[in-house]
Structure formats: structure tokens, C-alpha cells
A protein has these predicted regions:
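Histidine (H) residue identity feature
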Residues: 10, 26, 33, 99, ...
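Short, Asp-centered acidic motifs that coordinate Mg2+ and/or phosphate
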Residues: 30, 95, 116-117
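Active-site-proximal segments of metal-dependent phosphoesterases and phosphodiesterases across multiple
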Residues: 64-113, 148-151
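Active-site-proximal beta-strand elements of phosphoester/diester hydrolases
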Residues: 2-10, 92-101, 139-145
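Core catalytic region of metal-dependent phosphoesterases/phosphodiesterases
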Residues: 2-89
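Conserved beta-sheet core of the metallophosphoesterase superfamily
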Residues: 55-57, 101-162, 166-168
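Generic beta-strand structural signal
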Residues: 33, 89-90, 135, 163
Length: 168
């Protein structure tokens, strides 16, 4: 199963649509947004995927103040907004999604060994640098970077048991 992963879109509809286009081209079956969406119009763009059966999951980031509107937008497009920490299972893998602003909480989740994959955002920097994933305590740890246009390097990922990074 291919899974699209992005974070920190910060209301950038153009780059969000670029990521969605790449997710469509690669036939992803699910998309994970690791927070800092900012406002509902960004989420409505994902309808292009969810109307074709792609599952959409997201969590709140530290800049997501319009929580009720975001929750409604996820419901309208058929996605699930999972709160501050998301726990899902896809293709037999247990995922934890956390924006990552609290480093101690992030470390505690990774050290728990309860998840196969830990996805985080917040730093606007792809992690780990130079490679697509790092395994810590038997958990795949990744940060797709940021998809917003203010950033020097705009990136997202998709997971197919091999992680592929791409630039927007």
C-alpha cells in the first residue's frame, strides 16, 4: 500500500495540490497530514483523492487554531482528523502521527515501541537528512518536511515500505 505523507502546508493550496497530483500519479491509497494545515480550504483540496476512495488522516499542529473548521472540513471530504496525536493502522502497520512540538513527548512515543511508523512535522525539515527513514527502537521515524512556499525546500513523502521523497 502506498501512503502519501505531508506536513506543515500552512495554507499553501498550490503546493498542497502539487503533492496531491504526485499522490494521484503514484496511486496512493491513504494520505497522512502531520499538522499545521492552518485553515479548512486546504483540506477541501483533498476531495480529489477521497472521492476515489483514498483514506485521509490528519492531526492538529501548533498553528492550527481553527480546530472546529478543520474538523468539519475533514468530515466533508470523508477524512478523519484525529486530534493532537493520531493512532491508525494501515496495511497491518501501526502508525503514530504527532506534530512534534513537544520533544519529550515525541521521544516517549518513539521509545514506547508501540508503533511501526512514527510520523511527525513541525521542524519544516525533512528527517532524517540525507536518507528517507531512520529506525529507532524498531520504529520507522520520518518527517516529510514542509509543503509551504515560504520554505527554501518544499518536500513530501510517500511510503510503500520503501520511502520515496519528492520536491514540490
Amino acid at each position: 500500500m502506498k501512503i502519501g505523507i505531508l506536513s506543515d502546508t500552512h495554507d499553501d493550496i498550490d503546493n498542497t495540490n502539487k503533492a496531491i497530483d504526485i499522490f494521484q500519479e503514484n496511486d496512493v491509497k491513504a494520505v497522512i497530514h502531520a499538522g499545521d494545515i492552518i485553515s479548512p480550504p486546504v483540506i477541501t483540496e483533498f476531495y480529489r483523492l477521497t472521492e476515489k476512495g483514498v483514506k485521509l488522516f490528519g492531526i492538529f499542529g501548533n498553528n492550527d487554531g481553527e480546530k472546529r473548521g478543520l474538523k468539519n472540513a475533514f468530515e466533508i471530504v470523508g477524512g478523519e482528523l484525529l486530534g493532537d496525536v493520531g493512532k491508525i493502522e494501515l496495511d497491518g502497520l501501526k502508525f503514530c502521527i504527532y506534530h512534534g512540538q513537544d520533544l519529550k513527548k515525541k521521544e516517549k512515543i518513539i521509545k514506547s515501541r508501540k508503533f511501526d511508523v512514527f510520523v511527525f512535522g513541525h521542524t519544516h525539515t525533512k528527517y532524517p537528512k540525507g536518507v528517507d527513514t531512520e529506525i529507532i527502537n524498531d520504529t520507522i521515524v520520518l518527517n516529510p518536511g514542509t509543503a509551504h512556499s515560504v520554505a527554501k525546500t518544499k518536500t513530501s513523502n510517500f511510503l510503500d515500505f520503501i520511502i520515496f521523497s519528492f520536491f514540490l
